[in-house]
């Protein structure tokens, strides 16, 4: 008997139905939300990702605001674009698409974004608000993970969650989300310096793999019946591969596919952050 699929696409569609109604109410009140993107250069992956975000906007009625800039843009010109979106009343929230070309300082660009227009929830101010449990846009991927677990009635309160990966977009903020009183999980954050990773993952009720190492998590590392979320993305022989080996499906109780699991919810909660920012205005 295989694991239950944590279906991110179906869950995203449910979220979009809700967002469409909320956007319609905001529009009727004269406050249509707008999502902005700043894309520098012509990286195919980044272009596809931005196109997907704006296609999502069209589905729920959010206004799209695109700023596509040349790869050789100066820091001053990028700053001008960020400042313009900070001041643009039609732009409720926006993102600076990463990676940026090498001549640009990514951290400086992200810090220049108005924290109250931070659609990704990754501005240093908003990460600080998360630590303090103050209202702020939440990081999209961690929020999607928590939502997906709840959608499929995976018990979070009291659960031991092992997160593999300490990146700023997933691992670190996910630990903060899961240890809030509203979630009440116990979190072990693992990384390249962790000793005996399999011993830790075998104790876990929930494992989140977010490192970008193909098929890192194998069946012998998973406790029977555990929930496993596959977040990392890499390429093997030109094809997308996740961090979770296919044999895990025969042992785990729940597994998120990759693609089609957490990824769709990352995009859904980007839009959710924008709608919530509009509702606060």
UniProtKB/Swiss-Prot annotation:
HAMAP family: THF_DHG_CYH. This is Bifunctional protein FolD. One of its GO terms (molecular function) is methenyltetrahydrofolate cyclohydrolase activity. InterPro entries: Aminoacid_DH-like_N_sf, NAD(P)-bd_dom_sf, THF_DH/CycHdrlase, THF_DH/CycHdrlase_cat_dom, THF_DH/CycHdrlase_NAD-bd_dom. Catalyzes the oxidation of 5,10-methylenetetrahydrofolate to 5,10-methenyltetrahydrofolate and then the hydrolysis of 5,10-methenyltetrahydrofolate to 10-formyltetrahydrofolate. One of its GO terms (biological process) is tetrahydrofolate interconversion. It catalyses: (6R)-5,10-methylene-5,6,7,8-tetrahydrofolate + NADP(+) = (6R)-5,10-methenyltetrahydrofolate + NADPH; (6R)-5,10-methenyltetrahydrofolate + H2O = (6R)-10-formyltetrahydrofolate + H(+). It comes from Mycobacterium avium (strain 104). NADP(+) binds at residues 165-167, 192, 233. Pathway: One-carbon metabolism; tetrahydrofolate interconversion. Its EC number is 1.5.1.5, 3.5.4.9. GO terms for cellular component: cytosol. Keywords: Amino-acid biosynthesis, Histidine biosynthesis, Hydrolase, Methionine biosynthesis, Multifunctional enzyme, NADP, One-carbon metabolism, Oxidoreductase, Purine biosynthesis.
